[in-house]
């Protein structure tokens, strides 16, 4: 397969993954955790998945500790946990 064909295939797979919703059975359990700012005193803008609203929302992270429901971008949150 040519490199152009591989790029097209990769693009189609990426699009399919973006458009396929994540069911609650496929969602990692840490997506259900409440956001935790952690024990440090930083003020980093981060994203967490909110189970009740099915949306990725902003919270402020202290910089250490916390839990895995903590993403740098909305896209990363959506790809991992689903949501809007």
UniProtKB/Swiss-Prot annotation:
InterPro entries: Kunitz_BPTI, Kunitz_BPTI_sf, Prtase_inh_Kunz-CS, TFPI/VKTCI-like. Residues 1-24 form the signal peptide. One of its GO terms (cellular component) is extracellular region. Disulfide bonds join 31-81, 40-64, 56-77. GO terms for molecular function: serine-type endopeptidase inhibitor activity. SUPFAM superfamilies: BPTI-like (SSF57362). The keyword Disulfide bond applies. Expressed by the venom gland. Keywords: Disulfide bond, Protease inhibitor, Secreted, Serine protease inhibitor, Signal. The record marks 41-42 as: Reactive bond for trypsin. It is found in: Secreted. It comes from the Eukaryota. Residues 31-81 form the BPTI/Kunitz inhibitor domain. Belongs to the venom Kunitz-type family. Serine protease inhibitor that inhibits trypsin. PANTHER family: KUNITZ-TYPE PROTEASE INHIBITOR-RELATED (PTHR10083). This is Kunitz-type serine protease inhibitor B6.
């Amino acid at each position: 397969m040519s490199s152009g064909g591989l790029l097209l295939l990769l693009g189609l797979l990426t699009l399919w993954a973006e458009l396929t919703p994540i069911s609650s059975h496929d969602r990692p359990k840490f997506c259900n955790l409440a956001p935790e700012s952690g024990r440090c005193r930083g003020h980093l803008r981060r994203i967490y998945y909110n189970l009740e609203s099915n949306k990725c929302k902003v919270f402020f992270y202290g910089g250490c500790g916390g839990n895995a429901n903590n993403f740098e971008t909305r896209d990363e949150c959506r790809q991992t946990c689903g949501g809007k």
